[in-house]
A protein has these predicted regions:
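Short alpha-helix boundary/capping segments
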Residues: 20-23, 84
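Short, well-ordered loop/turn elements at secondary-structure boundaries
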Residues: 5-6, 25, 66, 245
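Extended, charge-enriched "interface" segments that sit outside catalytic cores
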Residues: 76, 82, 93-263, 267-270
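Short FAD-binding loop at a beta-strand-to-alpha-helix junction that anchors the flavin cofactor
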Residues: 1-20
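Internal hydrophobic alpha-helix adjacent to the cofactor/substrate pocket in enzyme cavities
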Residues: 24-47
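Active-site phosphate/pyrophosphate-handling residues
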Residues: 10, 27, 91, 263
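Mid-to-C-terminal Rossmann-like scaffold of FAD/NAD(P)H-dependent oxidoreductases
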Residues: 41-95, 99-102, 108
Length: 271
């Protein structure tokens, strides 16, 4: 959000090539945070592509540029399962609390939700159910009976089951759900159920994001005179010089930068 020409001058919205609506609001938030950090000292606040749609938007503006007013569509994000609307508070509240933007009471609510959600997940991961106690109920729910005992987690994975309808079949699960604060019961149970049912997809996407994030930690800004690296393609030299990406991962997302160009930079860095 900070212009390269004038230090401490931050822009947001249409001047950056986006619409003036939600996209501008998101940029304004990040620009304001970083303007404050610049004045008082500290590391820049950067949201990753796996942390927030604002992170996707800003990264696209920096690495790809725009030919028409940019709109933030979910299709632009490669980590849509990690950027679900149901866990935005989990992803971002702690960051805002650390910067003084979220108050203590909001942070306490987040911790309460996380602890209750995780307790439910731990319970279903460790609690075993036996066919003779649950099969008649499973058949009424329209799902196949168990042929042998298994963890309750595996039963929750079935599309016909929910934590609530299984709690009617498993008294111990009902007792666990009753520990959740009554005022937030529906919200917290839903959060736990989503993590359980989508666990395989979430883990798979997180592994991919973690691999990319390792490249995000390799900083290259200011380390190269790209025009002097003759082994880079002409297009790569021109675009890397113009954009001056912060990290290897950011460089890899610039249109026209090939995997071989990235490998050359990694070799020069001794990686």
């Amino acid at each position: 959000m900070e212009t390269k020409q004038i230090r401490n001058l931050f822009f947001a919205g249409q001047i950056n090539g986006t619409t003036g609506y939600e996209e501008a609001g998101g940029q304004g938030l990040v620009a304001g945070i970083n303007a404050h950090i610049n004045c008082h000292g500290g590391q820049p606040f950067i949201l990753g592509r796996d942390e927030a749609y604002i992170g996707v938007l800003i990264d696209d503006l920096v690495t790809k540029g725009v030919d028409e007013p940019y709109r933030m569509f979910t299709s632009r994000a490669e980590y849509r399962i990690l950027l679900r609307q149901d866990d935005a508070d989990m992803r971002l509240t702690e960051k805002s609390y650390q910067m003084g933007l979220a108050k203590q009471d909001r942070y306490d609510l987040l911790r309460e939700k996380k602890e209750s959600r995780d307790a439910i997940i731990r319970f279903v991961e460790t609690y075993s159910v036996k066919p003779q106690y649950i099969n008649s109920g499973l058949e009424k729910l329209g799902t196949a009976p168990l042929s042998h005992g298994c963890k309750l987690f595996d039963v929750v994975l079935r599309p016909q089951t929910t934590l609530e309808n299984l709690a009617d079949l498993v008294p111990a699960l009902r007792a666990e759900l009753d520990k959740v604060p009554a005022s937030r019961k529906e919200e917290i149970i839903e959060a736990a159920e989503i993590l359980i049912k989508y666990s395989g997809y979430i883990k798979r996407e997180q592994i991919i994001a973690d691999k990319i994030n390792r490249l995000e930690n390799i900083r290259i800004k200011g380390k190269f005179d790209y025009n002097s690296i003759q082994s880079l393609s002409t297009e790569a030299r021109q675009k890397l010089t113009r954009i001056d990406p912060d990290t290897i991962a950011q460089a890899s997302r610039i249109p026209g930068i090939s995997p071989s160009d990235i490998n050359i930079l990694l070799v020069l860095l001794g990686r």
